[in-house]
C-alpha cells in the first residue's frame, strides 16, 4: 500500500479534526459522526495532498480523504479525495481528485458489507460515495459508484471485479443515479448498460428516481 495512505489510515489520525468546510460538506450529505469515523474519512494534511495524488494541485487549499474499504477486510490501496475549492476547468467543475491512471473502484460502506455480500435483500447501487453512505445509514445493503460509469473498468462493459463476491442472482437491485437519467443521454445510456450488466449476472434491476429528480 502507498505508505502515505497507510499512515493516514493509521491510528495516529483516529479522532483527528476535519476542516470545518469539509465537515460541513459531509454533514450536508446527512452523514453522522459515527459514519465519518467508521469510514476513516479524514482531513489530508496540506503537505501530503500532492504526494498522495502524485502531481501538483496548487489551487487546492484543503481536502478530505475518502478511503475505500476492501469488502474482504482492510482498505484498498486507492486514493480519492474531495478538494476545496472545487477546480474550474474548460471541461467543467472538478470536486474530486485521484492519482492519474488509477481507474475506478467500487465503494463499500462498512456498515452494509455483510448484507451486501451475504443477504438476499434488495441491493442499492448508488452514484456517489457520500450518497451511498447516507443510504447505508438507513440499514439498506448499499454500494457506491464514482460517477455513472464507475461500475466497470475502462475498455470493458462487464461489472467491475470488485462486485464478484456480491450475490446477484434473483436479487432485486435498485439503481440510484445522481441525475435525471430520463433526459440526459449519457446518463441514460450508462444506466441501461449497468442494468444489462447486472441482468447478465441474474439480477432483477429497477431504476429509482429520487423525488428531487422528478420535479
Give, region by region, the residue ranges found by the protein language model.
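Phosphate-handling DNA/RNA-contact segment within nucleic-acid enzymes
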Residues: 51-172, 187
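N-terminal structured subdomain of primase-like DNA metabolism proteins
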Residues: 1-71, 75-80, 88-99, 133, ...
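TOPRIM fold recognition
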Residues: 1-18, 26, 30, 116-123, ...
